[in-house]
Amino acid sequence: MKKILIVGAGGQIGSELVPHLRSIYGNNNVVAADISADKCKALAEAGPFEALNALDGEAYTAIVKKYGIDTIFNLVALLSATGEKNPKLAWDINIGALTNSLYIAKDNNCAVFTPSSIGAFGNDTPKDKTPQDTLQRSNTTI
């Protein structure tokens, strides 16, 4: 049976994905983790939950080992509007969490999934019938 860790579980995608995966794999096989325990009360009541700052590699690794995780979903991201106001903070959080996820997955033989970001696109990207291979000039990168 898969043992899944969803980091950034309290966000827009994670809050929907955790209950769905728990319905498939069982509540105890899907661990939700987020920096904010307050916004994850429903997730914590339904199955395992860990408060985690994904930039803390030691704490992140400890959770992977504690639950015997074999699959990591990295959903950690600063919202685009916040990132536009503070691009360095967005870089530190988004890339830092991704880097930790990749190294921890490699070191613990885990599969890893991390989605792309709408923030990869900018004002010059075509808004209608956007091609698969298109211009990417983010407004939220340094």
Language-model features and meaning:
Residues T99-T140:
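Conserved Rossmann-fold NAD(P)-dependent oxidoreductase catalytic core, especially the SDR/UDP-sugar
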Residues K3-I24:
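N-terminal Rossmann NAD(P)H-binding glycine-rich loop of SDR-like oxidoreductase domains
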Residues G26-A37:
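Conserved glycine-rich Rossmann-like NAD(P)H-binding loop of the short-chain dehydrogenase/reductase
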Residues V7, A33, I72-V76, V112-I118:
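SDR active-site strand-loop-helix element
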Residues K3, N28-N29, A111:
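Residues at the starts of beta-strands that form the adenosine-phosphate
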Residues A44-D56:
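Rossmann-fold cofactor-recognition segment
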